[in-house]
Amino acid sequence: MKSQPVTQELHFIFPLFKTISSDIMSFLVSIAGIAMLAQIVLGTFANVFIVLVTCTDCIRRRKLFLADGILTSLAFCRIGMLWVILISWCSIVFHQALSLQVRFSICVGWAVTNHFNMWLATILSILYLLKIGNFSNLIFLGLKRKIKSVFIVVLLASLVLLFPNLITVTVCETVQANGYRGNLTGKTKRTYFMNLTAMISFTLDNIISFTISMVCFLLLIYSLCKHLRTMRLYGKGPHNPSASAHIKALQAVISFLLLFSMFILSLIISGYNYMKPLNEPVHLICQLIGTLYPSSHSYVLLWGNRRIKLAFVLAMVQVRARLWLKEEKP
């Protein structure tokens, strides 16, 4: 007799608990969506500002410096990547059924923008090392003299890793689109195999890029320590232009490595949960964390470049002054 009221209470509690947990998850998804949109807007603003400043200076000087060219290309890639992420996010959250051609376009667009975003940032790390690093090694000096050729070779070599990524992404999307025609076991095996292949190809591409940037970072630290030791030997203080250039380069590279690590980790976690629907919280949170990399690192580059930083500060001062004048008017 006593067990019947308990059973009735449990039948009442479980649906209530399920409703509360569903409401909490929808609230968290909404917060993540707002944060995602804010990151994309701020990241797009920073990258557009970098493009405008570098292009304006290029037109005024009638000359494009190598660093400005890399920064501009990187900014364009990040703008494209952020908007591809936004389109993908909206299609997942709002349950929009996309055609196969649109899904192909999103996957290919993401693969291309992610690849060049990653390798242009790596080339920027190499530029910092070759421009600021101080080594007497013959190989280093030879690379420093042929810096443009080094970048062309690195960029062309990275294309060797891009094509396998494009092939695996395209085949994976085709298998997922046509998987419903076969039996469930065959579909699951094909999807697992293609996702595993795509993850291996993507991880290989990222590990090579990450390793090159890490080597540049370690060599910059060694060069800075060597420079500070020389300054101490000659009785000079540590605060000098060369040390400041080393520190700024290290800040840019370490921020890239940290944000890039978070980006890779979020994609790996999302990849291992491929069996779950894309609107599950694990995928949405991974996308939110992954968006930090292309949006936040642009502000680090903006603040580390003296010319772009000055233009940014002046623009903010002008905006603030105009707002103040509007408030003062009766």
Curated annotation (Swiss-Prot):
It comes from Rattus norvegicus. One of its GO terms (molecular function) is bitter taste receptor activity. CDD domains: 7tm_TAS2R43-like (cd15027). One of its GO terms (cellular component) is membrane. Putative taste receptor which may play a role in the perception of bitterness. The keyword Nucleus does not apply. Gene3D superfamilies: Rhodopsin 7-helix transmembrane proteins (1.20.1070.10). The lineage of its organism: Eukaryota, Metazoa, Chordata, Craniata, Vertebrata. The gene is Tas2r136. Residues 54-73, 144-149, 223-248, 305-330 are cytoplasmic. It is found in: Membrane. This is Taste receptor type 2 member 136. SUPFAM superfamilies: Family A G protein-coupled receptor-like. GO terms for biological process: detection of chemical stimulus involved in sensory perception of bitter taste. Glycans are attached at N183, N195.
